[in-house]
Structure formats: C-alpha cells, structure tokens
C-alpha cells in the first residue's frame, strides 16, 4: 500500500530521442577522421627520425667519437674471432682443454663412457677452476676429479690407502687409469678409461672408434649449452644407474 501512495517520479532531463537517432548524429558530427590522425602521426615520426639522423651524423663527425670507433675496430682485429667456440678453445690456466679435459686427449677420449663427455660429479667445477672433492679425503676421493675425460665412476675415487693393490684398491678410479682388470695399475673395472664391466678383459679405450674433432666439438658445445639443473639431474641419473652400490 505504501508503494501505491508514493509520489510519481518525474525526470526533468528526459528526452524523446531514440538511441538510434542519437548514435547516428554522433557519427555524423565526428570531427577528426582516423586517416588524418594516422597521416599526422607519420609526419611527426618522419620529422623525429630526420632529427635523429642529423644528430647521429653530427655525433659521427665528432673527433672523440671517431677515435673511439677506431679503437673499437682495432680491438676487434686484435682479438680475432669472438664466438663461443673460439673462447672455449683458449686455455684456462693449467686446466685447459688441451691439458686435462681437452680435445687433445684422443687416447682417453676414445674410451668415453655412456655419458659422452661427462665424468664424475665435479666435472663442471673442475673445468671452471674449482677442485670440489665431495666429502672424503683425497685417496678416498668421493665422486671428484673427472674432467670430462671419460674416467669412469668418478676419477680419483678409490677404496683404500696406498698399500693395497698398487695404488690402493682402485685409487685411480674404477675404470680410470687403473682398472680392476688388466688395466695399468691395480684392480679396476676396464681397460684405460673405458667402459668395461669385463673384470679383466680390458674392454675399454683401445677398442673404441676414434672420435673426430668435429664430433668432440659438437658434443662439447651441446654439453656447455645445457643448464646447471639439467646437467645435475642427468648426472645423478647416470651415477645412480652405473654405481648403485656406492650410494652414500
């Protein structure tokens, strides 16, 4: 009942024009055309680019800028190629790619394990200048010094001191330079840095095909382009697959 007795609301600013008529009038009265705006924008950009070109020409004509450009060219000529392969080919101190983990070790690299150019857990650390022994002493070694040489199962890891079996029971690594079979020193698994699970048959480096320089370059570039997390996961999977008995 209260709603019926409410006074009627009358809006003073009402209009009888329909929406169609209103929008039609708005379209007719539209002032600037989009083409004109676009043309004016292009003209402003051309003016600005002409100013920039003049400024760049003035900068090039300055003697200080010319001297800096000449210095930059001579520096590039002095350094030669600056791509990643040229930088990787240069030695990094004593751990150069020709000294320990380099391309000039065909005998050891012929015996690359299934990991390609991967070694133990400290591959990347050693090549970038670290030493990173994981835990134990040097002879026991942990999974340590294996600089991308194909030394199987971690390089300098062994199980004993320098008294048992040459340099200890594999003090130069299982399948490293002294394998448990007829390797060079003591008892390791494999020949000379080879894959060998043959326990004395010496399946290793000398039976592998020789890798060319291009193949080694491609493997190394692919390895260096991977991220650290990807390499760590891949290396952990490889170590768990090949060395299940030494999970410490």
From Swiss-Prot:
Modified residues (Phosphoserine): 40, 49, 64
Glycyl lysine isopeptide (Lys-Gly) (interchain with G-Cter in SUMO2) crosslink residues: 70
Annotated localization: Nucleus; Nucleus, Nucleolus; Nucleus, Nucleoplasm; Nucleus speckle
Motif (GAR motif) on chain: 194-203
Gene Ontology biological process: chromatin remodeling; in utero embryonic development; mRNA export from nucleus
Modified residues (Phosphothreonine): 242
Positions of region (Interaction with PRMT1): 153-206
Location (main, coarse): nucleus
N-acetylalanine: residues carrying this PTM: 2
Keywords: Acetylation, Isopeptide bond, Methylation, Nucleus, Phosphoprotein, RNA-binding, Transcription, Transcription regulation, Ubl conjugation
Region annotation Disordered: where it falls in the sequence: 151-204
Biased composition regions of type Gly residues, renumbered to the chain: 157-195
Maturation and modification: Asymmetrically methylated by PRMT1. Symmetrically methylated by PRMT5.
Classification via InterPro entries: CTOP_PRMT1 (IPR052656), FoP_C (IPR025715)
Superkingdom field: Eukaryota
Protein role: Plays an important role in the ligand-dependent activation of estrogen receptor target genes. May play a role in the silencing of fetal globin genes. Recruits the 5FMC complex to ZNF148, leading to desumoylation of ZNF148 and subsequent transactivation of ZNF148 target genes. Required for the tumorigenicity of glioblastoma cells. Binds to 5-hydroxymethylcytosine (5hmC) and associates with the methylosome complex containing PRMT1, PRMT5, MEP50 and ERH. The CHTOP-methylosome complex associated with 5hmC methylates H4R3 and transactivates genes involved in glioblastomagenesis.
Matches recorded under PANTHER family: CHROMATIN TARGET OF PRMT1 PROTEIN (PTHR48426:SF1)
Subunit and interaction comment: Interacts with PRMT1 and PRMT5. Interacts with the 5FMC complex; the interaction is methylation-dependent. Interacts with FYTTD1, SET and PRC1 complex members CBX4, RNF2 and PHC2; the interactions are methylation-independent. Interacts with ZNF148. Interacts with WDR77 and ER.
Name of the protein in question: Chromatin target of PRMT1 protein
Phylogenetic lineage: Eukaryota, Metazoa, Chordata, Craniata, Vertebrata
């Amino acid at each position: 009942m209260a709603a019926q007795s409410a006074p009627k609301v009358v809006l003073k600013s009402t209009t009888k024009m329909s929406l169609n008529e209103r929008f039609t009038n708005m379209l007719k009265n539209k002032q600037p055309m989009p083409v004109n705006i676009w043309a004016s924008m292009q003209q402003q950009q051309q003016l600005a680019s002409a100013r920039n070109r003049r400024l760049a020409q003035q900068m090039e004509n300055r003697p200080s800028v010319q001297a800096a450009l000449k210095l930059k060219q001579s520096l590039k000529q002095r350094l030669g190629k600056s791509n990643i392969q040229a930088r990787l080919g240069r030695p990094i101190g004593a751990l150069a790619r020709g000294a320990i983990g380099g391309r000039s070790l065909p005998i050891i690299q012929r015996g690359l394990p299934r990991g390609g150019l991967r070694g133990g857990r400290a591959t990347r650390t050693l090549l970038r200048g670290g030493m990173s022994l994981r835990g134990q002493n040097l002879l026991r070694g942990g999974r340590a010094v294996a600089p991308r040489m194909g030394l199987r199962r971690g390089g300098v890891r062994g199980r004993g001191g320098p008294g048992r079996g040459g340099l200890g029971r594999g003090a130069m690594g299982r399948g490293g330079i002294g394998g448990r079979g007829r390797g060079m020193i003591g008892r390791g698994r494999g020949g000379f840095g080879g894959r060998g699970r043959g326990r004395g048959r010496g399946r290793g480096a000398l039976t592998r095909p020789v890798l060319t320089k291009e193949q080694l370059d491609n493997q190394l570039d692919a390895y260096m382009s991977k991220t650290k997390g990807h390499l760590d996961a891949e290396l952990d999977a490889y170590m768990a697959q090949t060395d299940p008995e030494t999970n410490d």
